[in-house]
Amino acid sequence: MMRRLHSSRRFSGSLLALALGLALPLAHAADKPAAGKPAASQPAASKPQGGEQFVDGIAAIVNKDVITMREVQDGVKRAKVDLKERGIQLPDDNVLQKQVLQRLIFDRLERQEADRLGIRVDDAQVTQAINMVASRNKLTPQQLRAEVEKNGLSWDDYRKSLREEIRTDRLRQRTIDNHIIITDAEVDAYLKDQARNPALQPQSAQAPVQEAPAAATGPVMLALGQILVRVPEGASPDTVASLRKKAEDILARLKRGDDFASVAAASSDGPEALEGGVMGVRPIDGWPDLFVKAVSNVPAGQVSGIIQSGNGFHILKVLQRGQAGAPAPARAAAPMPAPAAGRAAQGPVQVTQTHARHILIKTSAVMSDQQARQRLEQVRQRLESGSAKFEDMARQYSQDATAPQGGDLGWVNPGEMVPSFEAAMNSLKPGEISQPVESPFGWHLVQVLERRQKDVTDEMQRMQARQALFERRAGPAFEDWMEQLRAQAYIDNRLEKQERIEQNNR
């Protein structure tokens, strides 16, 4: 079902920080930069590789796609600039090449899967995102462009990077968000835990009746960095032991005082390695339980021990603890997320609820955006002419779980729907039907049936709890999904082969 729970990951801040080197507030989790990263020297011109030559300019093959050495070198140059701006010591060139190529391989896998699912991002959506980035950072689009170009990134490259970020965001929503189910029992247990744990409660203050789910009086926020030593799926006991030893050696270096960000950039297998390992900031209850427990007694500025998960061995650094609204750490990625469950200001919460229904047509390899929009336009014409009923059309055409109920979404609170859907819904008067509207789930026709004012204090608390539990799972679930995608793909890493050959020849 398309409503209510969706990842709060946002592309705008990460790209702005990447392009401008701005110290924005930290993002909620592991947002990846848009453009490539580090700079390294080009490998020696040519060396035989058992019949193939590295001189062909191919760094890797991912399924049927080629990643060229030029792409790696361009990414390396950008990464060197970015790392210097962040004050992070540059790894060796060969390490930077390896890190950049790994990022490019994951990016290519994401792009291929998005293409397979029919996820497209048009120029209008990119322009809308640029306007959002500029607005959030108190810039005009023209000023944003000037800053981007002043920092050495062409405007075309910036738009291309932003397009990729949007597509990845939509891919995450399409593949993960709909498959995470939070039960009422889990919400009940979460709220009980909140009540028992004073550290997770907002500051005491009576708030007046308000017209929206207001920002909290200060949820406890936690900013984390990570160094990940990845363990491949199906690794042998000897391989696992060797990788644990690698994690132990890294931890020993950190205990001796080595800079966490520099070690992360050189040694981490995590997607945020080239950002110095910075994963972001969230309400403390938005992090996976495994991480929260591991750093429960770790003061700001210190590192945890080694934590083992299904992905490998993690070492975490507590970058900051504090209330929402406190100054964020210097290394940044994106706008501060909205407070999570249990964080609503105390006192009654009055909202305008909307009773709505919709028809959803999903895009795919066989259903393009244009085809989906045209089909809904035809349905809308029938509805406007009175030759068909909305509920009948929903049962016949809608691909949402609400189709058997005639597309009825019930009463919807502000903030429950994805932004494009909510904006279209809010623009309608009762009885009106929207034009086709696009969301990460596909294309919709929306009809508003009625509106009402309601005290939703308890509902809002449960909704926020559900969202917090969802956020705990969404990030790790996407990482697991990407690992499975990688395991199923054909990947010929020629840089890695070249490195092994050179080591054997020494």
UniProtKB/Swiss-Prot annotation:
It is found in: Periplasm. The keyword Zinc does not apply. GO terms for biological process: Gram-negative-bacterium-type cell outer membrane assembly; protein folding; protein stabilization. Residues 219-320, 351-450 form the PpiC domain. Keywords: Chaperone, Isomerase, Periplasm, Repeat, Rotamase, Signal. SUPFAM superfamilies: FKBP-like (SSF54534), Triger factor/SurA peptide-binding domain-like (SSF109998). Residues 1-29 form the signal peptide. Gene3D superfamilies: 3.10.50.40, Porin chaperone SurA, peptide-binding domain (1.10.4030.10). Its EC number is 5.2.1.8. Its main location: periplasm. GO terms for molecular function: peptide binding; peptidyl-prolyl cis-trans isomerase activity; unfolded protein binding. It is an enzyme of class 5 (isomerase). PROSITE patterns: PPIC_PPIASE_2 (PS50198). It comes from the Bacteria. It catalyses: [protein]-peptidylproline (omega=180) = [protein]-peptidylproline (omega=0). One of its GO terms (cellular component) is outer membrane-bounded periplasmic space. The PPIase activity resides only in the second parvulin domain. The N-terminal region and the C-terminal tail are necessary and sufficient for the chaperone activity of SurA. The PPIase activity is dispensable for SurA to function as a chaperone. The N-terminal region and the C-terminal tail are also required for porin recognition. Chaperone involved in the correct folding and assembly of outer membrane proteins. Recognizes specific patterns of aromatic residues and the orientation of their side chains, which are found more frequently in integral outer membrane proteins. May act in both early periplasmic and late outer membrane-associated steps of protein maturation. This is Chaperone SurA. It comes from Bordetella avium (strain 197N).
